[in-house]
Amino acid sequence: MDCLFCKIIEGSIPSRTLYEDDIVKVIMDVNPNANGHVLVLPKKHITDFEELDGETIAHIHGVAKDMKKLLYKALNPDGLVLVNNYGITQVIKHYHLHLIPVYKKKQEIIDRNVIYEKIMNVK
């Protein structure tokens, strides 16, 4: 399969992994919209949420909830956007959630390795 996220999940493309279990992998976005922008990727290749069973949806959102708490502790954002893209807005055809912290004060995007270390040091 020629899916970027499947290659990241299998490890043939490196990523900054924040969390991983049998169902999902959470990584830092390589082109972040904000400091702390992360992706929750189901390990099974799924293109649309309609393909997900209720248990998997609940697990993905449970992990997203835990990541939200971690992002708030590590980065102290003023809010968070949770996004799914479908159809024309879905660049990579592998279902995933974006967690994008938002800040009242404009911030420059800093090195994602620095952000990664901040997040990992909270655990």
Describe each region flagged by the PLM.
Residues 1-123:
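HIT superfamily nucleotide-processing domains
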